[in-house]
Regions:
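Short beta-strand elements in bilobed, periplasmic/extracellular small-molecule ligand-binding domains
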Residues: 33-40, 156-166
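Short, well-ordered secondary-structure micro-motifs
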Residues: 49-50, 142, 171
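A short acidic, helix-capping loop that chelates divalent metal ions and anchors anionic groups
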Residues: 168-175
């Protein structure tokens, strides 16, 4: 089984990265063997969308006219059995660099599926997705909703939790001190649930 995680923070060793790693570790405890890869947005090149999507994306399924790391990261997502998306909240939104990635991928999918002459099914369709959000001074639920909207728009299946905040792992400030969202506990729950969802999908596909 293969899991691919994306840390949307501009810092590679802080709370978002820690919680994404904890979800992966929980998956490792729940299933074996597990091949895991985590990439950091801060270490990748994601240019802003140039709005060439209507003429280009409509005729090039799920590809972008701009050549950078967006295509490589999308390919890793497509190849994975499960995806983890993690991001902090900056000013009412995730970091601009990570948002550029989200915007580019969403545009590829939207314009191919709505403008393209041929309809190629989403290559991300049905892939289980776990969500992680961190907010220092506000509620992380806004970022969870943001990630949930993106993942469903491209066809992935966000894995929900049985307890608050339901959409994924949320943390308010330092996760070690957060007794409301209980991020470390939720990370373990999400990893186990994500492993089950990925295994069920593989079994259904005869993998």
């Amino acid at each position: 089984m293969r899991v691919f995680g994306i840390v949307g923070s501009m810092r590679s060793n802080r709370h978002t990265a820690t919680l994404v790693r904890e979800v992966v570790e929980a998956m490792e405890d729940a299933t074996s063997p597990l091949e895991a890869e985590i990439v950091h947005a801060a270490e990748r090149t994601f240019a802003p969308c140039r709005v060439t999507c209507s003429p280009y994306c409509s005729s090039h399924p799920y590809r972008c006219a701009t050549t950078d790391d967006v295509g490589t990261v999308l390919k890793r997502m497509i190849e994975a059995d499960a995806v983890i998306l993690g991001a902090p909240q900056y000013f009412r939104a995730p970091p601009a660099h990570f948002h550029a990635f989200i915007e580019r991928v969403q545009s590829m999918f939207f314009f191919h599926e709505t403008v393209g002459a041929a309809r190629t099914p989403s290559p991300l369709a049905g892939i289980p997705c776990g969500l992680v959000a961190v907010a220092e001074y506000s509620n992380p639920h806004g970022i969870l909703e943001y990630l949930h909207d993106f993942s469903t728009l491209v066809g992935m299946r966000p894995v929900l939790l049985d307890g608050f905040p339901y959409l994924g792992v949320g943390a308010h400030g330092d996760p070690r001190e957060d007794e409301v969202f209980r991020p470390h506990e939720r990370a373990k729950e999400l990893g186990a649930a994500l492993a089950r969802a990925a295994a069920a999908r593989r079994e259904g596909r005869g993998a």
